[in-house]
């Protein structure tokens, strides 16, 4: 067993899932925990700033700012089955990682997010490999952000659930970009896209260059055992439960994957299975997409109840139901920049 690796029992305790980012107060953490529990998420994240200015050498990742009662938030999360993930910038990691890990374990932290690491130089990559090993030995889950790209270390150290290394949703990518990524970046491994789904308060609406239904679909198309959802939103702003219902049910790890149709930079259709349930994500690039998907991956001899989430033509989500069987032909008609997500069970 490689140094820093873990037993199968400890590996099975690592929990993939979805997270929502909390604002930098105690109450925001508690509110996000309630939201996460209601929507079948597994984690909340305190991101940059929870221990002070992230790039300052005087900020201490061993102590939270006064606005956050971290023991209270972590304890409440345990009551509700929600883990707390903490962000630490590379400035703090380089100085204090060996102190951070035992302390966070004592606090009951579920995982870490590394920020602004050096994923380009030989020195930086060697440091990261050693840091990943250490995090893994403590049983934390790990998400590495910014320019680090997957190199296969998650095979040896399963605590490493995902990493950024991608121009994610925060940058407002267009539909050409979103339909190129499945054929390029995602060949290398998981990526945390930090979905910025708009809400009733208009968060990120001006920056979003694809439809809401495409955002739903991308959570199937894009593989990441840890998915960051609602990146710029607060729980109180998400008042339309019908629009975000799909996020409640979509898993982040899979038993089987089928790539059904697509053309790089133009469109993509992916089906993934967890247990007996299939999830489909279809996304169009900068042009309308009209095709037919054969449902040959479904189990024979039974009817599947299908829930479709698609664009309603007014900027929202429309939900409809149908029944399909193995071999059925599913028409896919998606407007440019749009998408369609499905649950088949």
Predicted segment positions?
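Catalytic cores of secreted or luminal carbohydrate-active enzymes
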Residues: 213, 217-258
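Conserved structural scaffold segments of CAZyme catalytic domains across common CAZy folds
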Residues: 1-79, 338-339
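Conserved, mostly hydrophobic/aromatic
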Residues: 36, 104, 115, 142, ...
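Carbohydrate-binding surface patches
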Residues: 263-300, 340-341
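Solvent-exposed beta-strand/loop surfaces of large extracellular or lumenal domains
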Residues: 307-327
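C-terminal beta-strand-rich structural cap/linker in extracellular carbohydrate-active enzymes
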Residues: 322-345
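Aromatic- and carboxylate-enriched substrate-binding clefts and catalytic-loop regions
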Residues: 48-211
């Amino acid at each position: 067993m490689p140094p820093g690796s873990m037993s199968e029992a400890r590996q099975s305790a690592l929990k993939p899932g979805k997270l929502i980012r909390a604002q930098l107060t105690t109450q925001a953490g508690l509110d996000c925990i309630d939201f996460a529990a209601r929507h079948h998420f597994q984690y909340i994240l305190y991101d940059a700033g929870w221990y002070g200015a992230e790039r300052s050498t005087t900020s201490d990742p061993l102590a939270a700012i006064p606005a956050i009662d971290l023991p209270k938030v972590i304890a409440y999360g345990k009551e509700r089955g929600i883990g707390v993930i903490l962000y630490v910038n590379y400035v703090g990691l380089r100085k204090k990682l060996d102190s951070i890990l035992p302390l966070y374990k004592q606090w009951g932290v579920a995982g870490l997010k590394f920020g602004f690491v050096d994923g380009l130089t030989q020195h930086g990559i060697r440091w990261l490999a050693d840091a990943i090993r250490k995090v893994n030995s403590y049983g934390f889950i790990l998400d590495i952000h910014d320019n680090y790209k997957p190199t296969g270390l998650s095979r040896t150290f399963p605590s490493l659930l995902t990493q950024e290394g991608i121009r994610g949703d925060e940058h407002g990518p267009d539909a050409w970009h979103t339909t190129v990524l499945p054929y390029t970046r995602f060949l290398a491994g998981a990526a945390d896209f930090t979905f910025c789904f708009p809400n009733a308060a208009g968060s990120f609406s001006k920056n979003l260059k694809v439809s809401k239904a495409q955002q739903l679909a991308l959570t199937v198309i894009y593989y990441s055992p840890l998915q960051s959802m609602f990146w710029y939103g607060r729980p109180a702003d998400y008042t339309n439960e019908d629009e975000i219902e799909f996020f409640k049910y979509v898993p982040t790890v899979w038993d089987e994957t089928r790539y059904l149709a697509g053309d790089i930079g133009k469109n993509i259709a992916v089906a993934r299975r967890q247990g007996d349930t299939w999830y489909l994500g279809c996304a169009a690039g900068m042009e309308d997409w009209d095709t037919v998907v054969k449902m040959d991956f479904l189990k024979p001899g039974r009817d599947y109840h299908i829930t479709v989430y698609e664009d309603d033509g007014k900027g929202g989500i429309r939900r409809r139901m149908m029944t399909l069987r193995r071999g059925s032909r599913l028409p896919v008609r998606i407007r440019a920049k749009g998408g369609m997500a499905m649950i088949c069970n």
